[in-house]
Amino acid sequence: RKQFNILVGKTTAEEAKLRLASATRLEAAPALEISGQDLLANVPRSVALHPEDIWKAINPQVSQLVDAVADMVARLGPELSSDLIANGITLCGGGAQLSGLADRIEIETNARVHIPEDPACAVARGLSLVLKYFDDFRPILECTEDRY
């Protein structure tokens, strides 16, 4: 929108994101022609959108996310660090599907990154298991003053 002065629909934006977005720069990837409403002339218009255009738009937020994960990993104590080395990081949420994100996190943290099947729903599925077996999880979920 800012670069091309064109307003596109949600479906078009989602298609562009899925086909072009990456947490790393994509060299020589093909452009995608998108159509929308020209915000200046108020008429329909098409533009060629390149992966580099998407990367420039999302890289500041991706870098902030990767830096936050790396900072968290740097603050782990020895016990959690050994767990991290043994088990890696599980990347959940819809953003986990962003091409190259797991690779960037692996490089920054020196830890393996796993993406579960259907990462957008992974947290909800895990929470449903906790609720289903709440009594089994109660000892680790209850906060007591002597624990914190």
Indicate residue ranges for each PLM-predicted region.
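Phosphate/ATP-binding catalytic cores across multiple sugar-kinase/actin-like superfamilies
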Residues: A57-I85, V130-Y133
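Conserved phosphate-binding/catalytic loops in two-lobed NTP-binding clefts
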Residues: D103-L129, F137, T144
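Interdomain boundary/hinge elements
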Residues: Q3, L7-T11, E117-P119, L141-C143
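Glycine-rich phosphate-binding loops at beta-strand->alpha-helix junctions
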Residues: A21, R25, S81-I105
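Residue-level signature of catalytic and energy-coupling elements of molecular machines
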Residues: V69, L91, L127
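Phosphate-binding glycine-rich/basic clefts of nucleotide- and phosphate-handling proteins
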Residues: R1-N59, A74, L84
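A glycine-rich phosphate-binding loop feature that marks nucleotide/adenosyl-phosphate handling sites
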Residues: E14-R19, G88, E145-Y148
